[in-house]
Amino acid sequence: GYDLSKLICGSYGTLVAITEITFKVLPAPEESKTLIIHNQKIEPAIFLLGQAISSSNDISGATFFPAKSKVPGCEMDIEKTFKLNDLKHEGSLTAIRIEGSKNSIDQRIENLMNELKLINFNTSILDIYQSEIFWNKVKNLEFFSSSKNSILRIVIPTSECVHLIYQLSNKFKYFFDWGGALMWMEAFELTEEMFDSIRKKVVKHGGYVTMIKNSDYLPYVEDVFTINRDRFNISQNIKKSFDSKRILNPGKMYTGI
């Protein structure tokens, strides 16, 4: 079933050796547009993204980039990353992507504008070409391009993402994807102690953190994946079921598994 395929895809080669793969391929969307809401602080931005996701407008992307600010050792400049003609205002970006047929997209954007009550908000709409450029930059993490700092990937319940940011005291360069459930973060001169502190905060809020890129300042971290003890025990039992002799990449994801 799908649960098994998801489990194997996320196991980094620690559970099975795959000899044959079947892909289900879907047609690419005919067109796409992106509704940008400017100059929102993190709390109202995440609230708007949550409303958009729970609506009937079938959105396919929801991300938030905070406004330019001073972050130690990081360049926090979204205007430099997103130089697009259709962006009419500066400041933070709250982006919602809609895909499908042209008529359907235009109608759903109109619906969203009404449902989110955006009549008095500063907004922009990216056409298909600029929309694709925008989301490719999001996907390729161009916000962190040329960075020599550590890059962390944090998955957290959407309801907890704002609390986590406040606990981190805005000391890091970051943006949110998945409507607030996925946080990408750049950390300057990250030490083992700092990383451990971030781990504890993330786990406290029901999430997990992965070290995607090490810096020269912290070239090695023993555990790049972080989960709470309950999930660790589940992962350990799964490992025993699939690979009881621990032949396949032992210790790659978690020490002792």
Give the label of every model feature segment.
Residues I119-I257:
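Conserved glycine-rich FAD pyrophosphate-binding loop
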Residues G1-F144:
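C-terminal substrate-binding/cap subdomain adjacent to the FAD-binding core in PCMH-type
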